[in-house]
Amino acid sequence: MSDFARNRKALHDFDIEETYEAGIALTGPEVKSVREGRANLRESYVRVRNGEVFLVGAHISPYKNATNVPQEPTRDRKLLLHRKEIDRLAGKSQEERKTIIPLRLYPKNGLVKLEIAVASRKRQYDKRREIAKKTAQREIERAMKERLRR
């Protein structure tokens, strides 16, 4: 099965250093909404607070069939990780230019999992260099394809 939500902008704006798989504490209506694909990770990030890890700023639209349950779309959601992973993430997030970002929400054995990454923000010239590299690679592939046709 495919992902429920992806943070495609993160791959463009950040250099990914290491990734972790985390469980996410959701309410029942939130799980149903996520399974419908109504989650957005674009402006979200991960914060370590008091030895616990939270997903901040993720938007999960309210499930329309759950009327009697109050639903807050952008509340902070607790992430479920092992203590060693939490300590490692806390240390990494204290380093200069490092941040923890969500990459994707996906199903695993009937549960909703979140892939998070320790990343550093790309500078503008890094983005330009990457675009130039992709363009050059595309030109090479196009030339090779044209060469093979002859």
Curated annotation (Swiss-Prot):
Main location: cytoplasm
MF (Gene Ontology): RNA binding
Gene Ontology biological-process annotations: trans-translation
Top-level taxon of origin: Bacteria
Keyword tags: Cytoplasm, RNA-binding
GO cellular component labels: cytosol
Compartments where located: Cytoplasm
PANTHER family: SSRA-BINDING PROTEIN, TMRNA-BINDING COMPONENT OF TRANS-TRANSLATION TAGGING COMPLEX
Protein family membership: Belongs to the SmpB family.
Protein's job: Required for rescue of stalled ribosomes mediated by trans-translation. Binds to transfer-messenger RNA (tmRNA), required for stable association of tmRNA with ribosomes. tmRNA and SmpB together mimic tRNA shape, replacing the anticodon stem-loop with SmpB. tmRNA is encoded by the ssrA gene; the 2 termini fold to resemble tRNA(Ala) and it encodes a 'tag peptide', a short internal open reading frame. During trans-translation Ala-aminoacylated tmRNA acts like a tRNA, entering the A-site of stalled ribosomes, displacing the stalled mRNA.
HAMAP family: SmpB
Protein name: SsrA-binding protein
